[in-house]
Amino acid sequence: MKDKIIYDFSYSSTKINEKETRRNDFIKITNNKNISAMSKIVKPNKKIVEIKKDEINNTETLIVNSETSFILKKLGMKQVTQKTIMLFDFLTEELLANNSYKQVKNIDPKVSFSLEYYAELFGRKFDSKYVRTALRKELTEEFSRFQSMKIVIKKEDGGEVSLSLASGYNTSGKTMSINLDIDLVRMILNSPLTILPKTSFLDNENYELSKKLSTHYHLDGNIKKGNNNILSVKTLLEASGTKIPSYDDVMSSNRAWKKRIVNKLDEILNKISKQQGIEWEYCLAKKEPLEVQIKDIKTYDDFLKLYVKYEYKND
């Protein structure tokens, strides 16, 4: 039996009574091609389906789906945002600049980068003292948030291991740096981590879908099976989170599901395609071409049966 991992994103001062567990530990892979670590931790862009309040302990548990939850203080706590997730993904990738997959000795938990590099990577302006000050403040707040977060690993013997995300940071001067928890770094270096296209960080709005396309495409197991370049429409809609409305929401309003769901997915995929050099098209389950044009699909159920075939032109 594998250890159960609980991803507890409360501040350390918050008492937690309710937690969601994951039954699967990090999977073993080869050739240093791994899945984004943060996607294993929390997915706040999913549509919230339930909120459980604990007035006594001053917490709210936002149940996102059957496998994932994250804990927030009811008062005064900043949420785990999309920006937080993107920054954590960026930091885990930067770890590989000074460390290697499965490394055991001489691990360097410190990640350093210039403020200008951060601005360029995330598509931010860097043309005035005011902007640079704002960026520095933003990173200070995010790093402070990391230092207050933790991961709890439940062991099968009934015990648990608590890991902080960071032990310290420095956002003064030209170089930004953060010391990630050494035990967390060991876990990251032994967990699935895919190097995402740098352009992924430019698009905050569609980041999760962009990451889904990249991680699925580059995972060794999918490459060996020959299905790394095809994803179902249903999976893509789920990865888009709240950016595309649900069918039920559409049908309870103007009922224009093609315009609000199909066209919106097309729009997002075209934007990602332009940013990352992806060629894509709709297809059937075994990559066969469609027998009709997408505009002629009659029902939403028929649309859900479709797949998207795609290739990274620069790979």
Can you say where each PLM-predicted feature lies in the sequence?
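Charged, alpha-helix-forming regions
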Residues: 1-315
